[in-house]
Amino acid sequence: MLTKFLASLAAAPLLATAWPHPSQDTFNNVTIFTPPATWTDRSTNYARTVLLNQNCEKEPYTLLSTWSESTEDGAYFPIYQSNDYGRSWDPLSKAYFTHGNFSGGAMLQPFLYEMAQPFGDYPAGTLLLTGNAIPADSSSTNIQLYSSFDKG
């Protein structure tokens, strides 16, 4: 028992030096998006983030973020992009769900996923966005899926 303990103590410095170290300093309290004061409901929900790296991109890596948003323009998932490890963010695109009659409805529970392997007609690196589209009368729940071959 003592021998195992001493062996683990001897191996600890090797593990500490082999552990990857971040190339950037850590930070906190970065605001990605602030709803305009003109919005009647100044809230967002279900924020999600994905690190893109299925094509072995070089640093700096790209982060994408999305969330649920309902505005006068309709419900959509905004896509924001960061190329500096999340220190700053810029709008990249918006995903509107257009199948069915969702006028005045809600889009909830977004999820971003970058495919690690090819599947059917989708190559590795394809970005998938899925969400729950609910019509204004709440008569159904509709899981919708969109794909992007250009990272957003």
Predicted ranges, named:
Residues 19-45, 50-105, 114-152:
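Beta-rich carbohydrate-recognition and catalytic domains
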